[in-house]
Amino acid sequence: MANASKTQIIDYEGHIIDDLKEWMSDNGLSKLGFNYNVIAILGSQSSGKSTLLNNLFKTSFEVMNTKLGHSQTTQGLWLSYDKFEDELAGGSSEGTDAESKNKSGDKPVVNPTLILDVEGNDSKERGENRLTFEHRSALFSLALADCVIVNLWYHSLGNFTASNYGLLKTVMEVHLELFHQNVNCPKTILMFTVRDWFEEFAPLDVIREKIIEEYVNKIWQELKKPKSSKNAKVDDYFIIEVVGLSHGIIKKDEFLKDIKRLRHRWVYELRPVNYSRNIPADGFAQYCHNIWNTIVKQSQLDIPSQQEMLATFRCQEIKNNVLNSISGMIKEKIIDSKNRYIENFKTWAETDIIEKSVNEYLIDASRYQRSICLKTLEELLEAIFIQLQTIVDNNLNYTQRILSSKFSKELNSMYSVCTTDKGYFLLSSDKNADATEQDDNLSNMDKSGESAKKGNQSKCINLWSNFLYNADMLEYTTISNFYDQYKKCTIEIVEGSMASNESKDSQEKKNHDFNYKNSLTILATSIYKDTNRIRSVQCNILIERIRATIKEELKNVDNMLVTVKCSKDYWDYILKVTNKLEDYIYTNLSKCFVNLKIGINTTHLNNGDNIYARLNTNSDYGFVYSHNDHMYDFSDDENNNFDEIDTEIDQSKNDMESLFNSKKFEIITKQNKKEKYVSSINNDLTKEMNNKKLILELKNFYIEIIIDALKIKLDEISNDIANVIINRFESVFNYDEIEQPRQWRNVSVVELKNIFRVSKDYAFLIVEILQKNIKIDKLDKHLPNNFINTDIIEKGKSKAKKRIQEICRDAQYIQETGGQMSLKNVPFAFWVILLILGWNEILMFTRLFFRLNIILPMFMAFIIIVGSCLYTGNAQVLSYLNKIAFIVIKHSYNFYKHLQTVGNQPTKPEKVD
């Protein structure tokens, strides 16, 4: 039940009304802050309390109609207000309160007062249950009011009930109960309004002394005080005021004058400057609600606790309102951040979000307990930071994608010279050449192709030998750039922002650091994957180039297949080449392999926190880093949960030292980056190169590469064993000791047989040589004896035997014929005579060629056959062709006559009409 000027806050049944907050807001009271006061009135029923308030504060509380008889009028507790607009309009300057005027002194400033009209005690309507409600209402009034008016009649001062002695005792007991623990509690104004007082009866000073001595002090002495207030005086808790009011009917004019004087005293003398209970106006409704509920539940009413509870409630409410007001802006920015990088995030967040939110929050929340206000402010900022974290994550993810791509491109570009060069190593005769020597002196070298190739070779070896160092330094640069971008997202906030008397420059500032670990972990994962990928590619390039070098060095093995005469010479040569290659690889490329090869077991590197230990992982290019006794795997397994890992890392004190080299990250995160990061990887590699276990592992690896290439070469030879045998046979059969072609016309049959036998034995000796039937310690482990498949050998032998026999038959034929059937023995004059005698035939064949298409294929086939025989020197076929030519020439004349007869037949004459 409320209207524009008043509202009921506690009904007759003792239930609090929920619309108090709305009523205060509608009447412009919720924005007063602490600039208001509360006054409550207690007294017997029908003692004129509401009448007094209506006259004193211009309120409109219901009053008793005496014509209808005495009855209960005010039920429960009602609340109204007075803004003292008449005082403001009148511009009274009689007040002495310094706060009653504004800073310019032109117009008085009077805080509004909330007036609490309490149901009268000693009520017949409530009967025996009245004491409960009276105690509750008194307790409620004292918890709220700056001033409590005790309304009593002059003629009842000597009575117990009518003089409100029992009520006064209840008031003082309750006040002591409420505030005895609060040393700095505000004093409550206890104002006794003596109604129907006449100066003729007794001076006001006498009445004041009587009330103080016989009522206040006596009751105070009778009270059972707690130990903390045993020696306390009544003046420590109350300000006693006694006011005499004339009879409202008999001396109405005097009564109104007394009311006016009391009103003026309240406005300019009695009222506290601000609400003494330190409850802001916007929290007054909730404070009333909390106080009454605590009283009804018969709980111990602790005013500081209630104030703390109200402060918590209101600060939370204000915080939520602020969050609601800015959530729309943040959501729009979050959506925008999904599509692009948010520029000037720091300025936008500090000015449009943080500063605006803090100011909006402190306007109302700063009126409540400072500790709770600041605590809730931290919660507000934390809630804002949680929302802003999404934008920061999107910005950092955008940054990490760019940096990840840049890292990959730069590392790839750094090694592009090695990727494009597909050649082989030029083996240096200097065994002590420094594999990591810089190519600064290459400009002084010969500019020939070989020198340029050596320059590229030296550059690639230098790059490969420093791969981990280059990747480590590039990682440092990348992470440093990421951290620089992250610092652009940090927000500067002002500590102690509630201290309004401090300038912003004098207030301490601190940065809020957003969580960047998720984005940094993704970037680190990408760096490790790209590094391992490029590392693997470069390792494969290095191995392929070594294989090409081995293949180049094994070229002489093909030449030896024709000339070698014993197995020992052949395999000693292969062993020599193997040792040469192994020595070159070990001397010049060992550091390259330690940098590039994944899976090499090391001591100094794997046990450190450098990049090598993180890169030396599985083929999925995940990365592993250790922290204390825990191991975290960041491979691409779907079961891995980065959030869970992040949580575990957060629980660790030095979590970032696990992700990166601790010194590196310490340098990166320093505000003043004067210290330069120096990678220790090359020093660790130098120590590692003296590790005997590593040296043995590397040498075994080199031997495996060389043997693999050698096996491929030997497999090629095995598959071509027939041609190898034939070439060896021809090198002895067709040429004599001084490498001159043999003249078979001058060789006897016996000599031919001996030559054939020797050549055949020499040719088939290669099979025994290739089977490695001798012991070679270094190669036996990898290349056993008789390693060539028997089937391959037999097939090769069979094919070679056929060809050898053909070669021998040709030699025998030449030996028998003496070479007479060869076209080389036909006189040149024969060809001239053949051309002259066969000229007409050539012309006839030419004419037939243009008439009969079948002649062309036959002619072309003939030309091809003859040309092939001439080219290959097939004497047998050429002899057949010679015989055919002689037969054609012998019978050419008869053939020519026949053609002339056919050609000279007269044509049939045409008929003439």
From Swiss-Prot:
Gene3D superfamilies: P-loop containing nucleotide triphosphate hydrolases (3.40.50.300). It is a multi-pass membrane protein. Residues 636-659, 703-727 form a coiled coil. Pfam families: RHD3_GTPase. GO terms for cellular component: endoplasmic reticulum membrane. Residues 847-849 are lumenal. Its EC number is 3.6.5.-. Residues 1-825, 871-913 are cytoplasmic. Residues 33-288 form the GB1/RHD3-type G domain. GO terms for molecular function: GTP binding; GTPase activity. GTP binds at residues 43-50. One of its GO terms (biological process) is endoplasmic reticulum membrane fusion. Keywords: Coiled coil, Endoplasmic reticulum, GTP-binding, Hydrolase, Membrane, Nucleotide-binding, Transmembrane, Transmembrane helix. It is found in: Endoplasmic reticulum membrane. The chain crosses the membrane at residues 826-846, 850-870. Disulfide bonds: none annotated. InterPro entries: G_GB1_RHD3_dom (IPR030386), P-loop_NTPase (IPR027417), RHD3/Sey1 (IPR008803). Residues 89-108, 436-455 are annotated as: Disordered. Probable GTP-binding protein involved in generating and maintaining the structure of the tubular endoplasmic reticulum network. Belongs to the TRAFAC class dynamin-like GTPase superfamily. GB1/RHD3 GTPase family. RHD3 subfamily. This is Protein SEY1 homolog. The gene is SEY1.
